[in-house]
Amino acid sequence: MIRISVDVMGGDYGPEVTIAGAAIAQKHLPKVHFLFYGIDEAVEPVLKKYPDLLSVSHFYATESYTRMDEKPSQALRVGRGKSSMWHAIEAVKNGEADSCVSAGNTGALMAMSYFCLKMIAETERPGIAGIWPTLRNDSIVLDIGATIGASANQLVDFAVMGASMFRSLYNVEKTTIGLLNVGVEEVKGLDEIKKAGIILSKVQFEGLEYKGFIEGNDIGKGMVDVVVTEGFSGNIALKVAEGTAQQISELLKSAMRSSIFSRFGYLLSQSAFRKLKQKIDLDRVNGGVLLGLNGIVVKSHGSASASDFSSAIRIGYEMVNNELLKKIITDLQCFHEKKAIFLNNKGESVIDKETI
């Protein structure tokens, strides 16, 4: 049995979407059991609409919930020990749940997860890893919004954790890594990015193949399995991709309605357009995983539909089923040992000289 705690009050639509999403996920996840956390009068009426959930869930009433516009510091101060978000995260800490899923306030979720679960010993800062549809297969991009700015060591940790997640999701032995930069040449970019590139290229680690720098237009091509960046750039890239996908969809709809001939052409090509929509739909892989914590927390889009939220639940389920946390801890320990040996032999000065 895989136990998933759900912040039922999270997101723009609350229980109407989160519980409906759980009902969809339950049909496809045979071993799932839900722990629902939320306000009694808001949750109970919705939960009664889904009798099939009653045998695979337990509802825990909470005093409060975290608003979408609440500042992280305020949400933590007011909601600690009281809110549905805090209790859902705390269930993972206490071993009552295997993963947590929330569509709530991103900043609050990051703050509560950080203070409740704490960081894995080998990491400095958490990152949000998102699944990204590409021309080849899905890629993982991190960080897409957890941190603003990152040191070379933090970028390297993101690379290792992203590789662990990719192998967990797609059952591959080796993962290719690229650092997002303003150019592919080694002399370009910020010093921290160049230092991270040197470490990843020099420290040999089984299961991780560093491919060098990639540019923003390479993400959608699927040039690498894992794209590593800091949260500011990663979040902008994500929002641009979402906006572009929406723009393409609207332009196609407009073109199809422009004349009777285009409408007829659309009818003949419906299956092809349906496949295109599925391919570029980021909601299909809705759910960013907070990596670097002593527990698995999945962040769904606040505006997610029930189907989208079920995708986030599926990701949380798969991460537990494939023992992501154990793989991350093992991989980080192993990589840090190899990195320490390299630095002891070569010294930090080697990295500094190569970035000049």
Curated annotation (Swiss-Prot):
InterPro entries: FA_synthesis (IPR003664), Phospholipid_synth_PlsX-like (IPR012281). GO terms for cellular component: cytoplasm. It catalyses: a fatty acyl-[ACP] + phosphate = an acyl phosphate + holo-[ACP]. It comes from the Bacteria. It is an enzyme of class 2 (transferase). GO terms for biological process: fatty acid biosynthetic process; phospholipid biosynthetic process. It is found in: Cytoplasm. GO terms for molecular function: phosphate:acyl-[acyl carrier protein] acyltransferase activity. Coiled coil: none annotated. Its main location: cytoplasm. It holds the Pfam family FA_synthesis. Pathway: Lipid metabolism; phospholipid metabolism. SUPFAM superfamilies: Isocitrate/Isopropylmalate dehydrogenase-like. Its EC number is 2.3.1.274. The keyword Cytoplasm applies. Keywords: Cytoplasm, Lipid biosynthesis, Lipid metabolism, Phospholipid biosynthesis, Phospholipid metabolism, Transferase. Belongs to the PlsX family. Catalyzes the reversible formation of acyl-phosphate (acyl-PO(4)) from acyl-[acyl-carrier-protein] (acyl-ACP). This enzyme utilizes acyl-ACP as fatty acyl donor, but not acyl-CoA. Homodimer. Probably interacts with PlsY. This is Phosphate acyltransferase. It comes from Bartonella bacilliformis (strain ATCC 35685 / KC583 / Herrer 020/F12,63). The gene is plsX.
